[in-house]
Structures are given as C-alpha cells and as structure tokens.
C-alpha cells in the first residue's frame, strides 16, 4: 500500500513539475541564443548566433544579394530622374515630394501610424537634398542602384523648405533654434526630426548601399517578435521599438520605428550641444559606448520604494510602468560605403566620408572597413517593466 501511495504522489508531483520544467528549458534555450550584457548599468541582450535560412526564409536571403545593373541602362535612368521624369528603364517614378508625404501622413495621424508599425520599420527611404555641397550625378547613380535593389520601398526627397514646414507644423518649440542653424546643421536636425516623426530609413544622398537591407530589417523584426513571444510574464508590455545604425552611429544612415525614444534622446542631445554649427553636421557617435553615454546624459531618475527608476515613468490603475532603454541594432558596415572621407586631422569613423565633391567611389568601397564577424549583433532591453504599486 505504501508503495502505491508513493507512486501515486510521484505521478502527481511529476505532472505538477512538467510545466515548470518546460518553462525552465524554454528560458534556458532563449538565453542560450540571447546572452545578457550589462554596460554602464544598462541591461542589453545580444543574439549570439545568426538567423538560419529556416528562420529568415529563402525570399529574404535572396533579396540580400547584390543587384548588378547595366551601366548604360543606369545612365538612361539617371538622366530621366535628374529631369524629374519617370525612369521607364527600371519603372522608377520620380522621388515622392516630401511636402506631399508630410501632408498625407499628417492627415492620417502619426500616432496611428506608429501603432501600425509597432515592432516594424516603415519601408520608406528618406533623403535630404539641397545641401550646399555640389550635387553630383554620382549621387543619382547611388539612388538608382538603391531603388532597383529595393523595389518594394518608397523613396522620399526632402528639401530645406520641406524641413522648415516640418518644424513649423510639428516642432514649434524648436523654431527659434532652427532659424539660427546653418544649412549643414539643418540637414542634421532635419534628419533626426524626420526619423523621429516618421521612422523608416534616413540616409545621405552621398551614401551608397552595397547590399539589399531587407534581410537586416526583417531579422531585427523577427528577433524582437521571437523575444517578445518568449517573455510570457504579465509584467512586460509588448512594445519593442527598433533602432538600426552602423556600429559607429552616423547621421548619414539610420533606421528606426516612428517615435523612437532613442532618436528623441539624440535630438535632446543636439539641442544641448555646444558644438560649433559649422562642424555640427560632422559629429559622429562611436559605437555602443557613446550610445550608452547618451542614455546617461539624457535621463533623470526617480525613487520608488527604495528602487531607482528613470524619468519615463507613468502610473495606471495603481501600477507603476517604468520605460527602459530601447532596442538597438548595429548592421554590418560592409553593407554600405560612402563618398566622404575625413582628413586625418578630422574625427574619423568606420564609414568612409569625404568633404569634397572629388572622390573615387570604387576606392572608397574597396577601402571600407572589413567586418569582423560580430556586426549583426542585436541588443535590447525590455521596453516596459511593471511594478505593483
């Protein structure tokens, strides 16, 4: 009889323990893929292995291949676009007017757009034209290559008048500061303001993408989705904003979801910056350490029940929600090259910049930094933690 009772309770205990065992193994598998990292008090998670064909899908991997374009057909397309005509060779319409883009999205309400693109990147390229350096036909060649290799993306061109309209309508508090900026500085501010307002991909015309980026964008979205689905606790609210950039954060290439908190921190940092306006548009950030420093500079803390939390905190139904740091992804520098190249005395970066219209794109590409195999590293921390009040 005793043996029967022991067997009975053993079976009951085993049934009770099975769900816990499964949960333990699930979390063990999760953290085997996503290893925790702490930098300056900020908790990140890094994906330690790349996505497989089964996870990404053959379609996304196929899109990442370099597209070869016939030089003569490219020249014909360049001529059409420079004359604001449709490029029938590749079926490319002239760039969308930023005024029309702004008007349409303002009418639809950007808060709704932000919700629609939750955990996703809007498939739109934005570029700012009309800077005071010479507009080169080579930049149009870069545009043709970009658009042919990304057929499902929209392409929006912003002028300084468009940026002025954006500030007047959406950023009244920055109007006075904006009016005092140089054209170069307006490019930089407009870059960040537009990135925050609309999300998508913002890039300099002088930057040449060497690879299709659908794979990187999709991998980021998939990683966020997988991580969120594995966190079953009711203490985590499901919103993981995505920010993507080269390993050295540049104002020449950034990707983000709309209303991204890290982009807002960059804007705040610029507003407080004492850098001379003439060099304001040439101030790159270098890697994750600089990003972490920005977090530290742009946040204040509060104390709840002897625990310190940051200023992005709100109370709902007697519960305290604390907003932590956003999702940051660094993409391989080999995915793009630029036409710029700082002089040795200037601040340099992993990307290739040139402060002159005289450059050799092939030389730039061939001398761009080589990847070390760790660039496709995905970092994040949970966006919201719930604390019972």
From Swiss-Prot:
PANTHER family: MANNOSYL PHOSPHORYLINOSITOL CERAMIDE SYNTHASE, MANNOSYL PHOSPHORYLINOSITOL CERAMIDE SYNTHASE CSH1-RELATED. It is a single-pass type II membrane protein. Residues 38-389 are lumenal. GO terms for cellular component: cell tip; cytosol; endoplasmic reticulum membrane; Golgi membrane; nucleus. This is Pyruvylated Gal-beta-1,3-epitope synthesis protein 2. The keyword Transmembrane applies. Coiled coil: none annotated. GO terms for biological process: 4,6-pyruvylated galactose residue biosynthetic process; cell wall organization; fungal-type cell wall biogenesis; mannosyl-inositol phosphorylceramide biosynthetic process; meiotic cell cycle. It comes from the Eukaryota. Its main location: endoplasmic reticulum. Residues 1-16 are cytoplasmic. Keywords: Cell wall biogenesis/degradation, Endoplasmic reticulum, Golgi apparatus, Meiosis, Membrane, Signal-anchor, Transmembrane, Transmembrane helix. GO terms for molecular function: mannosyltransferase activity. Involved in cell wall biogenesis. Has a role in the addition of Gal-beta1,3 moeities to galactomannans and their subsequent pyruvylation. Has a role in meiosis. The chain crosses the membrane at residues 17-37. InterPro entries: Glycosyltransferase_domain. It is found in: Endoplasmic reticulum membrane; Golgi apparatus membrane.
């Amino acid at each position: 009889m005793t043996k029967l009772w022991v067997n009975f309770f053993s079976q009951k205990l085993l049934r009770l323990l099975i769900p816990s065992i499964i949960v333990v193994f699930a979390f063990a598998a999760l953290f085997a893929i996503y290893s925790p990292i702490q930098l300056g008090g900020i908790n990140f998670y890094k994906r330690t292995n790349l996505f497989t064909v089964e996870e990404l899908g053959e379609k996304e991997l196929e899109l990442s291949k370099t597209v070869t374009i016939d030089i003569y057909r490219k020249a014909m397309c360049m001529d059409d676009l420079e004359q604001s005509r449709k490029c029938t060779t590749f079926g490319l319409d002239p760039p969308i007017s930023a005024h029309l883009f702004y008007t349409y999205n303002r009418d639809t309400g950007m808060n709704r757009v932000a919700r629609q693109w939750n955990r996703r990147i809007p498939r739109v390229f934005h570029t700012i034209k009309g800077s005071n350096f010479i507009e080169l036909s080579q930049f149009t060649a870069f545009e043709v290559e970009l658009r042919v290799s990304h057929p499902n993306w929209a392409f929006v061109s912003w002028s300084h008048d468009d940026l002025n309209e954006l500030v007047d309508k959406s950023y009244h508090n920055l109007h006075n500061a904006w009016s005092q900026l140089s054209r170069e500085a307006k490019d930089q501010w407009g870059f960040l303001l537009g990135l925050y307002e609309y999300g998508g991909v913002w890039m300099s015309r002088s930057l040449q993408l060497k690879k299709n980026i659908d794979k990187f964008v999709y991998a980021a979205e998939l990683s966020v989705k997988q991580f969120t689905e594995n966190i079953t606790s009711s203490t985590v609210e499901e919103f993981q904003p995505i920010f993507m950039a080269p390993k050295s954060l540049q104002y020449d290439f950034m990707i983000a979801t709309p209303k991204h908190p890290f982009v807002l921190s960059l804007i705040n940092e610029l507003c407080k910056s004492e850098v001379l306006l003439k060099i304001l548009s040439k101030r790159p950030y270098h890697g994750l350490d600089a990003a972490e420093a920005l977090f530290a500079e742009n946040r204040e803390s509060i104390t709840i029940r002897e625990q310190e939390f940051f200023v992005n905190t709100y109370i709902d139904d007697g519960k305290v929600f604390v907003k932590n740091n956003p999702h940051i992804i660094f993409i391989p520098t080999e995915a793009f090259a630029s036409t710029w190249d700082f002089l040795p005395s200037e601040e340099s970066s992993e990307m290739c910049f040139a402060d002159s219209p005289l450059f050799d794109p092939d030389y730039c590409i061939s001398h761009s930094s080589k990847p070390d195999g760790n660039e496709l590293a995905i970092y994040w921390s949970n966006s919201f933690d719930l604390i019972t009040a």
